[in-house]
Design a protein with these regions (language model features):
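Sec-dependent N-terminal signal peptides
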Residues: 4-14
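Sec/Tat signal peptide C-region and signal peptidase I cleavage site
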Residues: 14-20
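Solvent-exposed, well-ordered amphipathic alpha-helical segments
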Residues: 15, 46-52, 124, 128, ...
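Early extracytoplasmic/lumenal segment of secretory-pathway proteins
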Residues: 20-85
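Extracytoplasmic ligand-binding site segments that recognize negatively charged/polar headgroups
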Residues: 28, 32, 71-199
Length: 202
């Protein structure tokens, strides 16, 4: 089975690979900034970037099924949780270079993958129902406070972003404390979880 490289700073990875005429990027991201990065890479190196876009699960399935015949050189997706899960299947190879290590803080990279962007996990609130002073010093841990009973809506626990949030809390606060926190959040929910982020707001 072909192992592929997930690397956000592929400019650094491929900068000296002038023998490559093109590189195939399988991407689950959908941002104009990514396209601009590819264009800058091509302008600098002369290497053409072929982008195959799709949903994360579909791209992973395709790469896995194609095995050694996969055309993917680079796989880009959102969230370290997805990267960790795919890495656990042995689908990545060591992609670290001195340039990457110098540019990317250790907590934003692993041996086999590198982050290219950070995402803020923000909380939306209704100004009609929440007083600003209630949010003073607000943290994720604070969502378990009984004062929020019947006032919280959130996506399902099988959502990768929620799973990554919980993983970070386990890392920082420990499993026992995080379990207690999760029970507190569930007790404060206004309804059963459903829908995407937009559905929570509406």
């Amino acid at each position: 089975m072909k192992k592929i490289t997930i690397i956000a700073f592929f400019l650094a990875l491929f900068a000296n690979m002038t023998f490559a005429a093109e590189v195939n990027v399988f991407s689950a991201r959908h941002y104009d900034s990514d396209i601009q990065l590819y264009e800058k890479f091509t302008a600098k190196t002369g290497i053409k970037v072929n982008v195959v876009s799709g949903k994360d699960k579909a791209l992973q399935k395709r790469i896995t099924e194609e095995g050694a015949d996969s055309k993917a050189d680079i796989y880009i997706t959102a969230d370290a949780g997805r990267l960790g899960a795919f890495d656990a299947k042995g689908m990545f190879q060591n992609s670290m270079t001195s340039a990457i290590k110098a540019a990317v803080p250790k907590n934003f990279r692993s041996t086999n993958w590198t982050g290219i962007a950070k995402r803020a996990r923000i909380m939306y609130y209704s100004p009609e129902r929440v007083k600003v002073n209630e949010l003073n010093g607000m943290t994720y841990e604070g969502l378990a406070d009984p004062k929020w009973k019947g006032r919280i809506v959130i996506r399902k626990s099988n959502n990768i972003y929620n799973q990554s949030l919980v993983a970070s809390l386990v890392k920082n606060n420990g499993k026992k404390t995080t379990c207690e926190w999760a029970r507190g959040v569930v007790a404060n929910m206004a309804r059963d979880s459903k829908g995407n982020d937009r559905a929570q707001i509406l």
